[in-house]
Each structure stands twice: as C-alpha cells, then as structure tokens.
C-alpha cells in the first residue's frame, strides 16, 4: 500500500531562505505550499540566524512535513560570504532535525538533473519545469521555486529507493 509523504525542500540563504512543500504518492506530486523566510540585513548575524530559525520552525509547525531535503551550498570566492551561507544552511538543517524529521541533502546538480533531466541548467528552466510537474504550484521568489525543486528531487530519489527495496524483497523471495 502506498502512503502519502509530505516533503519540505529548503533552499538556504542568509537573506532569503526558500521553502517548498509537496506531497508524494507513488509517482504523483502535489503542490502544498511555498514561500520565503527572510532575515533583516541590518541586524547582527546571530539575530538573523534566529529569524531564519523562527521562520522555518513556524513553517514546519504549520505544514507538518514528514521529511526534509536541503540543498548543499556552493563555495564562493568570498570566504566570509561562504561562511555566512554555511551558517544559514546549518539553520536549514537544524530546524527540521529539531522537529524530528529525517533530513536529506542534495547537490545543486542533482536537483537540476531530477527536475530538468540534466545536471546543468538555468534557473528559468528549473522554474518552468516545476510548473510543468506541478501546474498548481506558485512561488513568490526564485528561492521558493528552487526549494520546490529540492523537494521534487527528494521525492524522486526516495521513490527510487522504495522501488529498489521492493525489488530486493521480491528477489529474496
């Protein structure tokens, strides 16, 4: 028997952290919600991280996902910016883990491959395919669209794992 799994995808960023929630039932995906949690750029780093944590925690409490997926961040030439992005990513991992969710991580090229079929592509291609895969999807920022793509990637990945386990069980007899 198939079960519906609610997945939150999170696209971490210090100024804007995108989130997108989908429900996966077998091979079908349904859009549940998306949005962006922001931090005030004029505040100190610790306060900004608290804003992100509080915002993500509210989303998790409101939508009650079963699993989370977070995108790996890329290394920037600016070491300070990379470190700050890493700290925001830490919040993106912490909030769902504190809520008791299993958290998966995906490289940006894995997300692109799952959504557009190739590991390299433009943001517009990703956003267009998110709308093709889920016509009712809406997103207020590119960060929210990217978060939906991360959730879609996780749904496809976990479906492959479930199928492989079923095949192993059948072969084992």
From Swiss-Prot:
Q: What does this protein do?
A: The RuvA-RuvB-RuvC complex processes Holliday junction (HJ) DNA during genetic recombination and DNA repair. Endonuclease that resolves HJ intermediates. Cleaves cruciform DNA by making single-stranded nicks across the HJ at symmetrical positions within the homologous arms, yielding a 5'-phosphate and a 3'-hydroxyl group; requires a central core of homology in the junction. The consensus cleavage sequence is 5'-(A/T)TT(C/G)-3'. Cleavage occurs on the 3'-side of the TT dinucleotide at the point of strand exchange.
Can you supply a Gene Ontology BP term from the record?
DNA recombination
Please tell me where Mg(2+) 1 binds in this chain: 11, 143
Q: Sorted alphabetically, which NCBIfam families does this protein's record hold?
A: ruvC
Q: Which organism is it from?
A: Brucella suis biovar 1 (strain 1330)
The enzyme's first-digit EC class, named in words, is hydrolase
Instruction: List, alphabetically, the InterPro entries matched.
Output: RNaseH-like_sf, RNaseH_sf, X-over_junc_endoDNase_Mg_BS, X-over_junc_endoDNase_RuvC
Q: EC annotation?
A: 3.1.21.10
Q: Which residues bind Mg(2+) 2?
A: 71
Q: Name one GO molecular function term.
A: crossover junction DNA endonuclease activity
PANTHER family in the record, alphabetically? CROSSOVER JUNCTION ENDODEOXYRIBONUCLEASE RUVC
Q: What is this protein called?
A: Crossover junction endodeoxyribonuclease RuvC
Which gene is transcribed and translated to give this protein? Answer: ruvC
Q: Which residues form the active site?
A: 11, 71, 143
Mind telling me which residue stretches traverse the membrane in this protein? none
């Amino acid at each position: 028997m198939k079960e519906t799994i609610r997945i939150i995808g999170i696209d971490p960023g210090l100024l804007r952290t995108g989130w997108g929630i989908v429900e996966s039932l077998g091979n079908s995906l349904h859009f549940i919600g998306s949005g962006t949690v922001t931090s005030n750029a004029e505040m100190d780093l610790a306060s900004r991280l608290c804003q992100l944590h509080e915002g993500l925690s509210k989303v998790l409490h409101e939508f009650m996902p079963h699993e989370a997926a977070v995108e790996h961040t890329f290394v920037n030439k600016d070491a300070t910016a990379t470190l700050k992005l890493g700290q925001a990513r830490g919040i993106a991992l912490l909030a769902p883990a504190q809520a008791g969710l299993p958290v998966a991580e995906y490289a940006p090229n894995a997300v692109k491959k799952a959504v557009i079929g190739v590991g390299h592509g433009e943001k517009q291609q990703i956003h267009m395919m998110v709308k093709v895969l889920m016509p009712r999807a809406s997103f207020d920022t590119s960060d929210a669209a990217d978060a939906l793509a991360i959730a879609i990637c996780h749904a496809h990945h976990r479906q492959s794992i479930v199928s492989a386990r079923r095949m192993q069980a059948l072969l084992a007899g």
